[in-house]
Amino acid sequence: MDEKSILTINVVTPDGSVYENTTDLVICKTTVGEIGIMPNHLPLLASLAIDEVRVKVDDENFDEIAVSGGFVEFSDNTLSVVASAAERKETIDVSRAERAKQRAEKRIEEAKNENNDIDLRRAEVSLRRAINRLNISKH
């Protein structure tokens, strides 16, 4: 790729770097909708939804990273994704994600039975994270 037509993407969590690459397109879902970021995009700061970040590798393939919310910042052709948790598609432990989904579903039922709104919301977030990881692992 021509130097002017690439951007650098870094995905980091509190545990360290999860992904770094150069590309000409990144697609991610913010809390207000999906966005595509290309080289020379206007500076941007947005909060991420629990979803995937897709990084174009070539004309037909994308790297996929599951993110559990966080922020995306773009300036000077550098895209930084800061997330509390992130996993590349190839490192997702499907059986672990299935167990997390089952635990979250059980916690949702318990919270509903106890009319505990705080635990219910926490369990729903855990369920969305587990489902996101499972969906990305199956692409």
From Swiss-Prot:
Looking up CDD domains in the UniProt record yields: F1-ATPase_delta
Question: Where in the cell does this protein reside?
Answer: Cell membrane
The record's listing under InterPro entries reads:
ATP_F1_dsu/esu_C_sf, ATP_synth_F1_dsu/esu, ATP_synth_F1_dsu/esu_N, ATP_synth_F1_esu_C, ATPsynth_dsu/esu_N
Q: Does the keyword Ion transport apply?
A: yes
Q: Which branch of life, at top level?
A: Bacteria
**Which cysteines in this chain are paired by disulphide bridges?**
none
**Keyword vocabulary terms for this entry:** ATP synthesis, Cell membrane, CF(1), Hydrogen ion transport, Ion transport, Membrane, Transport
* Entry GO CC: plasma membrane; proton-transporting ATP synthase complex
Q: Membrane topology per the record? A: Peripheral membrane protein
The protein's predominant localisation is membrane
Coiled-coil residues:
none
Q: What does the record give under GO molecular function?
A: ATP binding; proton-transporting ATP synthase activity, rotational mechanism
* HAMAP family according to UniProt: ATP_synth_epsil_bac (MF_00530)
* Stated role: Produces ATP from ADP in the presence of a proton gradient across the membrane.
Instruction: Give the matching NCBIfam families.
Output: ATP_synt_epsi, PRK00571.1-3
Q: What is stated as this protein's family in its record?
A: Belongs to the ATPase epsilon chain family.
Assembly state and interactors?
F-type ATPases have 2 components, CF(1) - the catalytic core - and CF(0) - the membrane proton channel. CF(1) has five subunits: alpha(3), beta(3), gamma(1), delta(1), epsilon(1). CF(0) has three main subunits: a, b and c.
| Protein name in UniProt | ATP synthase epsilon chain
Species: Ligilactobacillus salivarius (strain UCC118)
* Gene that specifies this protein: atpC
